[in-house]
Amino acid sequence: MTEPRTPEKLLAAKPPVLHHNSHSPNASLQLPSPIITRRTRTASTSARALENPVVTGMVKSFSRTKGHGFITPNAGGEDVFCHVSDIEGEYVPMPGDEVKYRLCAIPPKYEKHQAVHVQISHLTPEVHHKWEEPFYGGSSPAK
């Protein structure tokens, strides 16, 4: 019988291995390599992610143009990478949004984790944009 997987054990197992040449929306954060998207994730990896508990955190950064961001887990530990394909719901995440998600091990070594099935549970008071709204590179068009 295997030991239950808790968010603390998943995050503390090994620190994420980061690609040294990757850049993220926040200069101090590094992107994992390879980046696994919902489309490229295998069925078995997706099934394992669904076995993991739902955890909570806060969006640290998210770039709609780059298609990724990072979540700071409420339980502490390393910030978790999040790909745009794993965001569920109608709103684009913004820094400060509270989210719930599951951790998914990233192949081939399954040492790193990323956030999947990400749902915004509490929006920041700032104006949020829906995915279907036109995007103008961070600024609104002149009226």
Curated annotation (Swiss-Prot):
Transmembrane segments: none annotated. The modification Phosphoserine is found at residues 22, 24, 28, 33, 139-140. One of its GO terms (molecular function) is mRNA 3'-UTR binding. GO terms for biological process: dendrite morphogenesis; regulation of mRNA stability. The keyword Signal does not apply. It holds the Pfam family CSD. Residues 1-30 are annotated as: Disordered. Residues 54-121 form the CSD domain. InterPro entries: Ca-reg_mRNA-binding_domain (IPR052069), CSD (IPR011129), CSD_CS (IPR019844), CSP_DNA-bd (IPR002059), NA-bd_OB-fold (IPR012340). Keywords: Phosphoprotein. GO terms for cellular component: cytoplasm. This is Cold shock domain-containing protein CG9705. It comes from Drosophila melanogaster. The lineage of its organism: Eukaryota, Metazoa, Ecdysozoa, Arthropoda, Hexapoda.
